[in-house]
């Protein structure tokens, strides 16, 4: 990253950032594959392939600029199936290059913003998705209504490119990016626009996620502006956001033109207790007041997407429910606000009476069915949750096989350790334990019972059910009050940076 910083500082001296030459740097593709940000719990990271060399990248970009290569009919692809493989190969290589190059200037801007805010030491915790749950535990127990909102996809990839243009002023880079996107759309011209965007997001996940985040960031900028104007409270947690020149220009124009209308409109949005949480393409809006204000914000979202971003969304796709009666899904958890009722006997002089106390608690549950579905997809069990062997790993040593299964168990245990009820998590560990035993038995061409009797692997596999206090006992004494308090309460690991499959499957 230091080399990128020096290169971009030299480019800034020419009053603009030049990203186009970075596409032809071979170490860009090595960095993209060695730092795979989209790694999964169930699948190990892949290494850097030598096919992604500088010479191949130059050839692919030259072919992409050629007119005959840009448009390939469906009949040609049917005649020559090798074209399909080549197109996927071209798309994967150049997409990885685009993604890693376009992230560089924004990472440097974020680093400088964090340094100015003097929070660079806590940057790892800021990046953690688990920092959302302490916020939910602290705020949502005082709220009454919640609305699950799925942010709609843009109707065309050109909208994503237009938003990015206001941040980066490198014309050749955008020519190449637009040619790449139109090349992909022409290749998928026999499908609908929505199907084409969905295909692009699956085949080029990192580039699409980066462009999509900018689209969401623009819509959230307008939302946060109105939310701050309509509330007496200010959102201090967004002080490290990037500066958006285009957004401030729109806001200035909006205030000048509609200043009179704002004085009449904003009182309808007075809601100091509204809370907004968003991860990827899903957001949750919660409030303490009556559903009338929630409906106001609901229609505001609909009109914002339709008028400013040309995205069609139906009002019936946004539901408003009571928190005490509705569970919402976020980040691979099922969450709801549970009412705890307790009765206290009180006595005043000679009179005795009962007082019923109702308290709220955020209940976060491990979703057993989606977890089993993910394990079945990774070939650890069938759709009913019955463990099966993993023959693909049978060529590895016994130690490597056990270590792979233990790594998955540790990741799942850390990810779901903050849940209220862990019975589902113990069942998942049991499935992985039997799958590990069956894999070892398959490798040694034996039955499970004979393998366990011969090798005595039961003691070796006990680590699957290692409790959290055994890990914490390395830090605190076993008889300490802190250790017992941690055992009773749930623990959020705020430095978890990997992505959970269930988060992406929501």
From Swiss-Prot:
Q: GO biological process annotations for this chain's record?
A: mRNA processing; RNA splicing; tRNA processing
Sorted alphabetically, the keyword list is: Chloroplast, mRNA processing, Plastid, RNA-binding, tRNA processing
GO CC aspect terms: chloroplast
Cited InterPro entries: Domain_X (IPR024937), Maturase_MatK (IPR002866), Maturase_MatK_N (IPR024942)
Q: What is its main location?
A: plastid
GO function term, MF aspect, one: RNA binding
The subcellular localization recorded is: Plastid, Chloroplast
Transmembrane parts of this sequence:
none
Role played: Usually encoded in the trnK tRNA gene intron. Probably assists in splicing its own and other chloroplast group II introns.
The UniProt entry, under HAMAP family, shows: MatK
PANTHER family noted in UniProt: MATURASE K (PTHR34811:SF1)
The similarity annotation says: Belongs to the intron maturase 2 family. MatK subfamily.
Q: What is this protein called?
A: Maturase K
Q: Which organism is it from?
A: Trifolium fragiferum (Strawberry clover)
């Amino acid at each position: 990253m230091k080399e990128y910083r020096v290169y971009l500082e030299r480019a800034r001296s020419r009053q603009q950032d030049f990203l186009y030459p970075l596409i032809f740097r071979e170490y860009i593709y090595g960095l993209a594959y060695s730092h795979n940000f989209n790694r999964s719990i169930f699948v190990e990271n892949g290494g850097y392939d030598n096919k992604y060399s500088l010479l191949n990248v130059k050839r692919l970009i030259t072919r992409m600029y050629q007119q005959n290569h840009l448009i390939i009919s469906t009949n040609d692809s049917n005649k020559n199936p090798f074209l399909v493989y080549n197109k996927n190969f071209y798309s994967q290589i150049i997409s990885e290059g685009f993604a890693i190059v376009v992230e560089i200037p924004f990472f440097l801007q974020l680093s400088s913003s964090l340094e100015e805010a003097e929070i660079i030491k806590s940057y790892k915790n800021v990046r953690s998705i688990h920092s959302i749950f302490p916020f939910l535990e602290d705020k949502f127990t005082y709220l009454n209504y919640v609305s699950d909102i799925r942010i709609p996809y843009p109707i065309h990839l050109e909208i994503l490119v237009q938003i990015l243009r206001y941040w980066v002023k490198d014309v050749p880079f955008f020519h190449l990016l637009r040619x790449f996107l139109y090349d992909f759309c022409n290749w998928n011209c026999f499908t609908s626009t929505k199907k084409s965007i969905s295909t692009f997001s699956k085949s080029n996940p990192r580039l699409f996620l980066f462009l999509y985040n900018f689209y969401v960031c623009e819509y959230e900028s307008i939302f946060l502006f109105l939310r701050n104007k309509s509330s007496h409270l200010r959102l201090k947690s967004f002080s490290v956001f990037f500066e958006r020149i285009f957004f401030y220009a729109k806001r200035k124009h909006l205030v000048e033109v509609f200043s009179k209308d704002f004085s009449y409109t904003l009182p309808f949005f007075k809601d100091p207790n509204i809370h907004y949480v968003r991860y990827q393409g899903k957001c949750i809006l919660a409030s303490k007041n009556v559903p009338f204000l929630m409906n106001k914000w609901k229609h505001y979202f609909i009109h914002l997407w339709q008028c400013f971003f040309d995205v069609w969304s139906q009002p019936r796709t946004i539901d408003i429910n009571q928190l005490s009666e509705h569970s919402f899904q976020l980040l691979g958890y099922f969450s709801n606000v549970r009412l705890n009722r307790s009765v206290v006997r009180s006595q005043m002089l000679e009179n005795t009476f009962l007082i019923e106390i109702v308290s709220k608690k955020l209940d976060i549950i491990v979703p057993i069915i989606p977890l089993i579905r993910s394990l079945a997809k990774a070939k650890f069990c069938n759709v009913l949750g019955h463990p099966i062997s993993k023959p693909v790993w049978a060529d590895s040593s016994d130690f490597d096989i056990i270590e792979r299964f233990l790594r998955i168990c540790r990741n799942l245990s850390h990810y779901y350790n903050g849940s209220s009820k862990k019975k589902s998590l113990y069942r998942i560990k049991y499935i992985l334990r039997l799958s590990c035993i069956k894999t070892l038995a398959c490798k040694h061409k034996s039955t499970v019972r004979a393998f366990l009797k011969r090798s005595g692997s039961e003691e070796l596999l006990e680590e699957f059910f290692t409790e959290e206090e055994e890990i914490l006992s390395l830090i605190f004494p076993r008889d300490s009050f802190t250790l017992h308090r941690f055992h009773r309460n749930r623990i959020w690991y705020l430095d978890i940076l990997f992505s959970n499959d269930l988060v992406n499957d929501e």
